[in-house]
């Protein structure tokens, strides 16, 4: 009686363990695209929107995949000089188009309404307003702002 119970327990243990191992998604480690050949022609820089590098060991070749403005993907050899030049240009353009975190935070504070506003009036000539705004990463408090 004990042997079948132990075997059943062992079976459930192995089954429980294998569910966790086999349930791991393959897509976590697999790239979305693999390149098996490269374009032989230079793509006009004006048609490109972005790029991604393919460096996975699951793909036969390391590659750069350029994404065109029409959302087409084109494989290119990362060792080619024109590919490296295009990557630098796209990186430079990306840096210009994205505002820095400081500017994003400042504009978010200016454009959003305060979360907690307390208004108090002392007199008509000397009004005092207290604002207390809290965001996920920054806390700004302005107290005793006199408005004439």
UniProtKB/Swiss-Prot annotation:
Gene Ontology cellular component list: axon terminus; C-fiber; dendrite; endocytic vesicle; extracellular space; perikaryon; perinuclear region of cytoplasm
UniProt keyword Transferase, yes or no: no
GO MF, one annotated term: cytokine activity
Keywords for the protein's UniProt record, in alphabetical order: Chemotaxis, Cytokine, Disulfide bond, Glycoprotein, Inflammatory response, Pyrrolidone carboxylic acid, Secreted, Signal
Post-translational modification: Processing at the N-terminus can regulate receptor and target cell selectivity. Deletion of the N-terminal residue converts it from an activator of basophil to an eosinophil chemoattractant. N-Glycosylated.
Subunit field text: Monomer or homodimer; in equilibrium. Is tethered on endothelial cells by glycosaminoglycan (GAG) side chains of proteoglycans. Interacts with TNFAIP6 (via Link domain).
Function of the protein: Acts as a ligand for C-C chemokine receptor CCR2. Signals through binding and activation of CCR2 and induces a strong chemotactic response and mobilization of intracellular calcium ions. Exhibits a chemotactic activity for monocytes and basophils but not neutrophils or eosinophils. Plays an important role in mediating peripheral nerve injury-induced neuropathic pain. Increases NMDA-mediated synaptic transmission in both dopamine D1 and D2 receptor-containing neurons, which may be caused by MAPK/ERK-dependent phosphorylation of GRIN2B/NMDAR2B.
Protein name (database record): C-C motif chemokine 2
């Amino acid at each position: 009686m004990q042997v079948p119970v132990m075997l059943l327990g062992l079976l459930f243990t192995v089954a429980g363990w294998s569910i966790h191992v086999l349930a791991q998604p393959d897509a976590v480690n697999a790239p979305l695209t693999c390149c098996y050949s490269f374009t032989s022609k230079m793509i006009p820089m004006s048609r490109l929107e972005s790029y991604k590098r393919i460096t996975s060991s699951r793909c036969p070749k390391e590659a750069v995949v350029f994404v065109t403005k029409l959302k087409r993907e084109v494989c290119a050899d990362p060792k080619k000089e024109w590919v490296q030049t295009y990557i630098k240009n796209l990186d430079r353009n990306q840096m210009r188009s994205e505002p820095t975190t400081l500017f994003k935070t400042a504009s978010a504070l200016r454009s959003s309404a305060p979360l907690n506003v307390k208004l108090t009036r002392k007199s008509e000539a000397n009004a005092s307003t207290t604002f207390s705004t809290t965001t996920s990463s920054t806390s700004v408090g302005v107290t005793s702002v006199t408005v004439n």
